């Protein structure tokens, strides 16, 4: 089945590409069939990395539908735990993530997607973080021993203005 066939299947039916059943450790670890292991909440962790710079951009979760759509459309889709809904990256901001490669770990319970980015519709540089930084990992934990750790900014400037990009959209960060 070609990528175009898979894409057409996704766009014309609600059936996902066939994920194999997990039948043996050997099949999962050494086989060539995709048999992802979703957790008890129906999600799998996903690390998103820039395809060219190798920079870690973000961490999110995918449910089965998000993984199916990501594979089929080559655009990153995630499951938003805070909003409890499917989330196509860039739907609000215009900052889509175009998938170049998808990796899965040895026991098929964690995904890495390598992406290229687009710039926000409202202007600014390419980024992945809703706070405005290029990466969601824009701070480093510093301190040692018995000291209370501090957070040190490793990205000094925001890539875009989140107010201009998101407007009145509710902030997904929860306390």
Identify the function of each model-found stretch.
Residues 3, 7, 12-43, 51-52, ...:
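C-terminal binding/interaction regions
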């Amino acid at each position: 089945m070609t990528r175009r066939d898979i894409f057409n299947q996704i766009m014309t039916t609600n059936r996902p590409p066939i994920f194999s059943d997990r039948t043996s450790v050997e099949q999962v670890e050494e086989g060539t069939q995709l048999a992802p292991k979703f957790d008890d909440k129906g999600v799998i962790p996903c690390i998103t990395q820039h395809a060219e710079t190798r920079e870690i951009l973000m961490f999110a979760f995918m449910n089965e539908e998000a993984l199916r759509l990501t594979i089929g459309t080559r655009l990153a889709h995630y499951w938003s735990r805070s909003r409890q809904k499917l989330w196509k990256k860039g739907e609000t901001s215009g900052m889509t993530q175009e998938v170049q490669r998808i990796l899965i770990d040895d026991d098929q319970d964690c995904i890495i997607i390598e992406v290229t980015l687009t710039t926000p519709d409202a202007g600014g540089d390419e980024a992945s973080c809703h706070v405005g930084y290029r990466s969601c990992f824009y701070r480093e934990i510093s301190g040692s021993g018995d000291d209370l750790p501090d957070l040190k900014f490793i990205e000094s400037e925001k890539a875009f203005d989140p107010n201009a990009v998101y407007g009145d959209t509710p902030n997904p960060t929860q306390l």
